[in-house]
């Protein structure tokens, strides 16, 4: 399973990647913003899931999510928002835009694993 992690913080990308690796998911691709994320999706058409931050430069996570959903292959791709945007209206906006789940930072490894479990395959 290949997972794309998109966050402008290299520290956060490393934290999320380490959580995924500790669960046995070694095939991880990273991007620093939505534009780079779209480029990674084009370069890696076999991505099985995307975890994306909301607040990023160049293209934010909500716009990135919308761009993914506009493509035929992306319409079924699980996309999980991982963000500090904890307000109810933001959660609703992300789900309406097509997010499959929503993780609020800060989080624990158990929260990430539990939220991703329905979408993960080994």
Positions of predicted regions on the chain:
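Two-component/phosphorelay signaling modules centered on CheY-like receiver
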Residues: 10-29
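Helix N-cap/capping motif at the beta->alpha junctions
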Residues: 30-39, 61
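Short amphipathic alpha-helix used as the core "switch/output" element in two-component signaling
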Residues: 39, 62-75
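Active-site beta3 strand of CheY-like receiver
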Residues: 45-51
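Receiver (REC) domain active-site loop signature in two-component systems and cognate sites
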Residues: 56
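C-terminal output helix
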Residues: 107-116
